[in-house]
Regions:
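Targeting/processing segments of secretory and organellar proteins
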Residues: 1-3, 10
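Terminal, non-catalytic protein-protein interaction segments that mediate quaternary/complex assembly
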Residues: 9-246
Length: 246
C-alpha cells in the first residue's frame, strides 16, 4: 500500500526544537555582535522573504540562497546555537548503516520518526547507506580531479519521508576537502541546523583537512507560526522552541 509522501523539512529534526546539547551555548546578540552565518540567513528570510501558502501553512521564503561555511564559521554556529549533537550523531550512524527499522532509532532516544510507522521507506537510510563505501573510496584515492557525489531521493519513489537533501558532493582542492550540498527545501528553524551538523560529521570521516561546506538552498523558509520565535532566538532567547509543521 503506498505510503503518504511527507516532506522531511519540518519533520526531520523535531528533536532540535526541544533538545539542545549540554555542551552548546546560546550567544545573545547586541548591536555590536556579529551574527553567525546561520543566524544571518534567518535574519535575511525575516527581512527579505516572500510569502507563500502551501498545504502545511504559510511560509516566508527565499529562493536559491547559499551558505559557504569555513571551519571557523562552523565553530561559530556550533558555539552560538543549540544543536542536539549526540542524537544527530546517533541518527547519522544509523542512516549510514542503512537502518530502516524505526524501533532502532527509539532505542537511542530518537522518536521523531514514529509518525512513519515501523519502517522508513525510501528515506534517508536508503541513500546514506551508500556513504561508507564512498568515504572509503575518497580516503583511498584522494583524487583531485574526481568528483565524488552522493545522490539522494527520486521524484517518483514511494516514500514516507522524502529527503530534503538532493545531493552531497565531495571534492579535493590543494589537499583540502570541499563539501557541497544541494538542498531542495529547507525549514530554516528545524532542518537546516541539523543538516549543517550532519554534513560536518560526514566531513570528519574523510582524512583531509576541511576547507569549506557550501549549502545551496533552493528554497529556505520560516513558517508563519515560527516567525516570532525566530525573532526571539535572534534576540538571544535561549529557551525558544519552534512549532512543527506537517
Amino acid at each position: 500500500m503506498p505510503h503518504k509522501l511527507q516532506d522531511a523539512c519540518s519533520v526531520f529534526y523535531q528533536a532540535y526544537s526541544s533538545l539542545t546539547s549540554k555542551h552548546a551555548t546560546f550567544a545573545p546578540f547586541s548591536n555590536q555582535t556579529v551574527m553567525n552565518k546561520y543566524h544571518q540567513i534567518l535574519q535575511k528570510v525575516l527581512a527579505d522573504g516572500k510569502c507563500q501558502t502551501n498545504r502545511k501553512g504559510s511560509i516566508r521564503y527565499l529562493l536559491n540562497e547559499q551558505l559557504v561555511l569555513s571551519p571557523a564559521d562552523l565553530l561559530d554556529i556550533f558555539e552560538g546555537h543549540g544543536i542536539a549533537r549526540k542524537k544527530l550523531k546517533n541518527e547519522l550512524h544509523l542512516f549510514m548503516q542503512g537502518e530502516r527499522n524505526v524501533e532502532k532509532y527509539r532505542e537511542v532516544g530518537i522518536n521523531w520518526w514514529d509518525y512513519c510507522g515501523a519502517i522508513l521507506v525510501n528515506s534517508y537510510p536508503t541513500y546514506f547507506e551508500k556513504l561508507p563505501p564512498l568515504i572509503a573510496k575518497i580516503n583511498h584515492e584522494k583524487r583531485n580531479s574526481k568528483n565524488y557525489v552522493l545522490f539522494l531521493g527520486s521524484t517518483d519513489a514511494e516514500t514516507n519521508q522524502a529527503p530534503c537533501l538532493s545531493l552531497v558532493q565531495f571534492q579535493i582542492e590543494n589537499g583540502e576537502l570541499v563539501v557541497s550540498a544541494y538542498q531542495r527545501s529547507s525549514d530554516a528553524n528545524l532542518g537546516l541546523p541539523a543538516d549543517i551538523y550532519h554534513l560536518y560529521l560526514m566531513a570528519r570521516q574523510i582524512d583531509l583537512p576541511l576547507k569549506s561546506i557550501t549549502l545551496n538552498l533552493a528554497n529556505v523558509h520560516i513558517y508563519e507560526n515560527n516567525i516570532e520565535h525566530t525573532r526571539q532566538l535572534l534576540d538571544g532567547n535561549e529557551n525558544v522552541r519552534f512549532e512543527l509543521n506537517v
